[in-house]
């Protein structure tokens, strides 16, 4: 199963602070435009959507893939195509000395060399299942407009290039199918803006911003073409790619009233094909943002509605040849914090242009999976509890609230202490260490619950369960 996994000869590990004890912000200069979180949330009224949301909230841990033509040279994602000033330095670093026009020609041309001959979707799905992931978010199309599915409405796709005769040329179909077979909930990432589409960026005009490069009010017929193009592609994904649970829409500047793509109609039509579909129109509160998506950050406090932090494992969304990896501790601690605050954690991985998931990714995910096999009861299918944090300890609860879980998030570079303590959440009887089922008595010291730790425990995050006195 590992024959197509590359072993890196030199790895630089970046043990980035997890933000476990305060709000974490993991954005770096290598990331593109970073979305915030919506200020408001509107609960859905459709019973099937509410049911699906509840099921999704049980899953807690999702794998997100950014994979496209940007993976060939290893340039994170497609934001360098945008001529806004914030991306100028990035373009110069990628293609020194090139004009913006030359850069665009070079970037569009990457489609001619994207040939992921080592892509094995079943292998990906098996790896991610073993790592403890429960749902998938896969980039069917980023802002560059390159489709990772065989769209009938454009030739700018993986199925029309060098990989057209590949075993899995309709990539998204095979990714969804492989992960679905492993029991994953399936999410289709789709970019609302499409910079390759002539009815969004007219190739005869300059492209000074991320927005349409023509006046929509003056050329409504051109914008109508784009509305239809978007509706057609989403309908393809909803009709021809099996059961889809989440429609994850990126590009929050495409919204009413200036860039109205008639999303209400699109989502209504999608739910005729996919009943209960969760719509995630990022950063746009209302009927089509069924859960919120703080990007590269964790909210400061608990939220009482559905949300997901999407954070990269490295310093970029897509694959890059010089990655800075976050640690196993960071992944586990971040998952504990997000879960205690009521969210789900979508961890992003970028496969290479060949379709390879790097060995250093696998090493980390394998260890995370082992931890979750022993301690996952404290994560999966849990809900929030009011007293959810004390120092390095995060608390979750089972659905009836009668069992609490305490997760000690071991800080990077530290050893387990002699004891763990917290205030509140007093156990009713002994506490159980999930990794081995052993029970411990607790004591009260200075108004705190204290648990003495035995010697010989592996130096990693610990999870305990106990009944409450409430």
Language-model features: locations:
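Bacterial Sec-dependent N-terminal signal peptides
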Residues: 1-25
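Mature catalytic domains of secreted/periplasmic carbohydrate-active enzymes
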Residues: 23-470
């Amino acid at each position: 199963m590992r024959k197509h996994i590359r072993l890196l000869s030199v790895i630089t590990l970046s043990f980035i602070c997890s933000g476990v004890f305060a709000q974490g912000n993991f954005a770096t200069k290598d990331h593109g435009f970073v979305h915030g979180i919506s200020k408001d949330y509107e609960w859905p009224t459709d019973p099937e959507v509410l049911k699906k949301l509840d099921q999704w909230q049980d899953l807690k841990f999702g794998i997100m893939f950014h994979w496209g033509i940007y993976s060939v040279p290893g340039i994170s994602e497609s934001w360098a195509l945008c001529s806004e000033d914030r991306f100028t330095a990035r373009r110069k670093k990628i293609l020194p000395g090139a004009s913006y026009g030359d850069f665009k020609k070079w970037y569009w041309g990457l489609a001619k060399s994207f040939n992921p001959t080592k892509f094995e979707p079943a292998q990906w799905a098996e790896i991610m299942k073993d790592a403890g992931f429960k749902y998938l978010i896969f980039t069917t199309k980023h802002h560059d407009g390159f489709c990772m599915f065989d769209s009938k409405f454009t030739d700018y796709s993986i199925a029309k290039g060098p990989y057209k005769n590949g075993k899995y040329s309709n990539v998204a179909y095979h990714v969804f199918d492989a992960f679905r077979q492993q029991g994953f909930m399936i999410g289709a990432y789709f970019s609302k803006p499409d910079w390759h589409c002539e009815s969004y960026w007219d190739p005869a005009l300059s492209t000074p911003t991320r927005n349409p490069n023509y006046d929509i009010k003056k050329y409504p017929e051109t914008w109508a073409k784009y509305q239809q193009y978007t509706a057609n592609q989403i309908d393809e994904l909803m009709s021809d790619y099996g059961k889809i649970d989440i429609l994850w829409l990126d590009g929050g500047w495409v919204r009413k009233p200036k860039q109205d793509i008639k999303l209400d109609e699109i989502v209504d039509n999608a739910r005729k094909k996919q009943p209960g579909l969760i719509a995630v129109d990022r950063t746009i509160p209302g009927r089509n943002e069924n859960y919120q998506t703080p990007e590269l950050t964790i909210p400061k406090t608990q939220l009482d509605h559905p949300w997901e932090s999407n954070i990269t494992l490295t310093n970029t969304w897509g694959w890059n040849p010089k990655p800075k990896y976050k640690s196993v501790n960071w992944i586990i601690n971040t998952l504990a914090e997000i879960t205690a605050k009521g969210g789900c954690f979508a961890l992003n991985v970028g496969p290479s242009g060949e379709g390879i998931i790097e060995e250093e990714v696998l090493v980390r995910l394998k260890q995370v999976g082992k931890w979750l096999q022993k301690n996952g009861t404290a994560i999966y299918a849990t809900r929030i509890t009011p007293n959810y944090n004390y120092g390095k300890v995060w608390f979750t609860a089972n659905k009836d609230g009668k069992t609490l879980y305490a997760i000690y998030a071991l800080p990077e570079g530290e050893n387990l202490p002699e004891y763990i303590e917290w205030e509140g959440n007093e156990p009713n009887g002994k506490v159980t260490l999930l990794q081995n089922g052993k029970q411990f008595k607790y004591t009260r010291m200075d108004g705190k619950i204290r648990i003495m730790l035995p010697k010989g425990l592996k130096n990693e995050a610990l999870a305990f369960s106990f009944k409450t006195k409430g």
